[in-house]
């Protein structure tokens, strides 16, 4: 890795919102998030991480068993689970029904079926590691 004087990895903006998820199957999670519209930012020097973007937000997937922890107690807690209890990743989509169909085809749990909530149409599901995801399709100015 190349670091600047500020300690930032070369080529990686310092002021981006980044969300990191520790996952049990890096390839499966990576593929799923790509199909949900995320873009891949290759980082060949970090084999146990996958960097993705969605707009200006970064999602960093790390292998739960290969990526380091900052202390032994956090590692123990992360591996015992449940993963991310209380955490919800919200992903906008242009086609909620197609995203819901993808979730079902993948055999992933849906915890709230699609419903209208006034400002958007939403549904909730769990990703392969049990992280809760809310998908939202915003209403157009005409209300559809």
Predicted region positions:
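Short, small/polar residue-rich loop motifs at catalytic or cofactor-binding pockets
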Residues: 118-120
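Glyoxalase I/VOC metalloenzyme domain signal
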Residues: 1-17, 21-42, 54-111, 126-144
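A short, aromatic/hydrophobic, helix- or strand-capping loop or linear motif
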Residues: 42-48, 115-116
């Amino acid at each position: 890795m190349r670091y600047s004087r500020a300690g930032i990895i070369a080529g990686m903006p310092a002021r981006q919102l980044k969300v990191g998820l520790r996952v049990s199957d890096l390839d499966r999670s990576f593929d799923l998030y790509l199909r949900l519209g995320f873009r891949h930012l290759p980082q060949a020097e970090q084999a146990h991480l996958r960097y993705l973007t969605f707009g200006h937000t970064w999602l960093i997937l790390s292998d739960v068993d290969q990526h380091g922890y900052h202390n032994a107690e956090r590692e123990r807690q992360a591996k015992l689970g449940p993963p991310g209890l209380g955490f919800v990743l919200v992903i906008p989509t242009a086609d909620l029904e197609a995203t819901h169909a993808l979730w079902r085809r993948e055999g992933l749990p849906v915890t709230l079926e699609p419903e209208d909530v006034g400002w958007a149409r939403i549904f909730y599901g769990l990703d392969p590691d049990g992280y809760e995801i809310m998908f939202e399709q915003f209403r157009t100015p005409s209300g559809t």
